Amino acid sequence: MNNKINNIKITQVHSAIGRKYDQRLILVGLGLNKINKSVILANTNSIKGMVNKVKHLLKIENM
């Protein structure tokens, strides 16, 4: 059985200015605070849920 957890690369491509407060908090929770900043995170259900809420602000790539 393969125990390797897949990672995803998330890049913020749009500003959080004018967005709802909870969307800004989700970006901070993902480690994003500036446009064009990227983070590599484990592809878990909790991360997928957060990404789904702000997918219009992000670019997502599988690693």
Curated annotation (Swiss-Prot):
Q: Which parts of the chain span the membrane according to its record?
A: none
What is the protein's species of origin?
Rickettsia africae (strain ESF-5)
Q: Name one GO molecular function term.
A: structural constituent of ribosome
**Family, similarity comment:** Belongs to the universal ribosomal protein uL30 family.
Q: Which domain of life is it from?
A: Bacteria
Q: What name does this protein carry?
A: Large ribosomal subunit protein uL30
| Subunit structure of this chain's protein | Part of the 50S ribosomal subunit.
Does the record bear Hydrolase in its keywords? no
Q: What is the primary gene name for this protein?
A: rpmD
Tell me the Gene Ontology biological-process terms attached to this UniProt entry. Answer: translation
GO CC: one term?
A: cytosolic large ribosomal subunit
CDD domains documented for this protein: Ribosomal_L30 (cd01658)
Q: Which UniProt keywords apply?
A: Ribonucleoprotein, Ribosomal protein
